[in-house]
């Protein structure tokens, strides 16, 4: 019996969208989009995250100034109920994503042993 992995992947995608954690994340994002202050801060934060990822990808360590800026962003996000709700929802969905990633990559890890 041949398994169509694309069908399985599409079924997984639908399953993720049906999760209560995914729905909570969608609702939290909609609330951010309706609030200009939260939306602006979230946009600034995601741009800052991309900047840090760029540094890391080029082998550069974040400077103390960048680390201070990250702490400042984290404090602002924790202080904003909409952003805090979104971050919490992201973490909840992230548990599923991490588990799924572990399962999917298990066969490749078996080969690498």
Swiss-Prot record:
Family annotation (InterPro entries): Com_YlbF (IPR010368), YheA/YmcA-like_dom_sf (IPR023378)
SUPFAM superfamilies: YheA/YmcA-like
One Pfam family this sequence matches: Com_YlbF
Family membership noted in the UniProt record: Belongs to the UPF0342 family.
Protein name: UPF0342 protein SMU_782
Source species: Streptococcus mutans serotype c (strain ATCC 700610 / UA159)
